[in-house]
Amino acid sequence: MKRTKSIHHASFRKSWSARHLTPVALAVTAVFMLAGCEKSDETVSLYQNADDCSAANPGKSAECTAAYNNALKEAERTAPKYATREDCVAEFGEGQCQQAPAQAGMAPENQAQAQQSSGSFWMPLMAGYMMGRLMGGGAGFAQQPLFSSKNPASPAYGKYTDAAGKNYGAAQPGRTMTVPKTAMAPKPATTTTVTRGGFGESVAKQSTMQRSAAGTSTRSMGG
């Protein structure tokens, strides 16, 4: 009888240990799951130009200049293009547009159309850029040009947006934020001109999608 009693005690101890270790195991699993989620995001800094970046990153002036110049080239390739200066100004405001290089991603037929109407086509000035580490753990930096409208009637007014129209908040350089790694991926080249107000519509749609996604995520976390 004593031996049987001893066996029951051992069984009890195992059962007690299992019940009390389970929450710990779940917590460890949750930590690894969160770590996996974090790997899909990237911390980036927002700068207006290379000088802003250099001031915030002493000793990294060369990297800041390279990232800024690369962002300018990317802006030429991916920024919304307009057939006339007036269309661009209506979207982004006076003093916010420039002539785009003829080779900046546009299809030849659209270049010809723009040249017939005004001699060239137009694009917004790069208002700033995002800068983050290169994917894959590289030693270099990735960058993404940002645009902003000075026209109060535009959905992009006072905001940083990328070439696809995604909104990254107030157009205030010096901020640091977390973005999906896809945000730093190269955007497709612009191959057609945008109609007046077309980019603003894209920004409005993207903002609606972002709010909807944020609401869905909040509801999911809250059960």
Curated annotation (Swiss-Prot):
| Leader sequence segment | none
Output the InterPro entries linked to this UniProt entry.
Biofilm_formation_YgiB (IPR009576)
Pfam annotation, one family: DUF1190
Q: Where is the composition biased (Polar residues)?
A: 204-223
Record's compositionally biased regions (Low complexity): 178-195
Coiled-coil annotated residue ranges, if any: none
* Region feature Disordered, mapped onto this chain: 178-223
Q: Which family does it belong to?
A: Belongs to the UPF0441 family.
The identity of this protein, by name, is UPF0441 protein YgiB
Q: Which gene encodes it?
A: ygiB
